[in-house]
Amino acid sequence: MAWRGSEVEAGAGDASRARGRLAAFRGELYRCLTARADELFELGDAVLCSDGPVRVLAGLSLVPGHRRGHGAVYDALNAGRVDVPRLRWAVGAVPLPAWPDGRIRLAADVCAWLRPEARTSPERLFCHVHGRGRNAGQMIPGWPYSFVAALGPGASSWTAPLDTVRLGPDDDATQVTAAQLREVAGRLERAGAWRPGDRDIIVVLDCGYDVIRLAWLLADLPMVLCARLRSNRVFCAPPAPKPPGMGGPPRQHGAPLRFADPATWAAPAVTGQASTARYGTVQVAAWNRMHARLCKDTAWEHHPGTLPVVEGTLIQLRPARLPGYRELKPMWLWASGPAAGPGEVAVLWQAFLRRFDIEHTFRFFKQVLGWTAPLLRDPAAADRWTWLIIAAYTQLRLAAPLAADLRLPWQRPQDPGTMTPARVRRGFRAVRETVATPAAPPRPCKPGPGRPKGSKNQHKAPRHDVGKHTTKRWKRTKRRTRAKQAG
């Protein structure tokens, strides 16, 4: 990126370099806003300079430094334009969290912008929301967004969001995630964050992803996928050699390993234990070259020829304790590396534990930055607002070394390098005064005529259904299920 050179020339001191990086990113962000740029830029600053959590979008027009009215706020989101490919490059050019081994850890997850009452908003899907009780989850209409973020070492509430894509009614979540990870990996390589010869990038996922299919789609990339599995899964070992003289095709599946049946667990290839502060002593076991049986009735329906055998490393974690007095159950992970040694197994499961840091980022987006606060009708406007939130969070990452600890009297002091995102946001207004603001002041204008007094709206917005568009495969599977239930 062009702005990366300016950050190096910003000065000799650490504070000067950090201020130069922040100013350069803000300038590049402004150039990514191709329509309503001034208002969109000031809107992002208002999110960061607000005294408390963002509750109402129009209330950002009252934040000091915002020079336009509340009508301009919604007009910018509805009629503005954001050069998303260029903004992706700007966000990816920011230095990633550094690990001691220099290896990059990424996390992919889906977070929903719930819109249950927005009947006039198109492209809403049913999003799963966890309840407090057991089996209390609900399916609520909303816009699901797939995020990819870089993780940092140690317990931290910081991540580095790199990309987001809204899932539509016609999208296959696995294919969208694969394309998203492929694009992020290529962008990191072109930006110099990953170079040929470096160790493979680790991507951690939750159990909602089809990690087997993802590993097959991304087999040509220097990437290791590590995902949590549900406790009812069954995996197979490599097949044993056929006895001499026995005909027929070669075997594809060996002895099954059922997660719910310990009697089927063969001797693991890797065993060990590690001490953690949160989970106590964790017992680790790993089986190499384990694969799952694939079926043509699922997403592999249109796969040409024989279904592939995607081998990986199966990892079992047995913690000594869990937060919240929950029942102790083993956690199962599957990594796309077929034969991981003890060191690689430890790196993989410890990287997966850092996946929960992205939950802090989602909570900060919603509860503090007001990601889901606007009542927007157009999903394109929601996409613009989402990228503004990511750009605002990136500015907090760059401003972390510069922000003062403006703590409340009952809060503990924090060092500049360890402040939380909420604490950095509290001091961002003072940091903003030390860097340039490329947004131009508003020009004087007169209000428009508006709707004539006493007239009613004659063009009502259309109503839209919720959910994915049905396919022939889904209908055929539904018929088969009904036939089996009938007898």
Regions found by a protein language model. Give the residues of each.
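Single, function-defining residue in the core of a domain
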Residues: 1-33, 119, 155-487
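Gly/serine-rich nucleotide phosphate-binding loop at the start of the catalytic core
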Residues: 2-78
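Generic alpha-helix structural propensity
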Residues: 39, 52-55, 68, 72, ...
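A generic secondary-structure signal
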Residues: 46, 63, 93-94, 184-191
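Active-site-proximal, Lys/Arg-enriched surface segment
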Residues: 47, 76-156, 161, 165-166, ...
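Short glycine/proline-enriched coil/turn segments at helix->beta-strand junctions
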Residues: 53, 101, 220-223
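A residue-level signal for conserved active-site and pocket-lining positions in enzyme catalytic cores
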Residues: 60, 148, 391
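Short, basic, glycine/proline-bearing loop/turn elements
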Residues: 74-80, 197-200
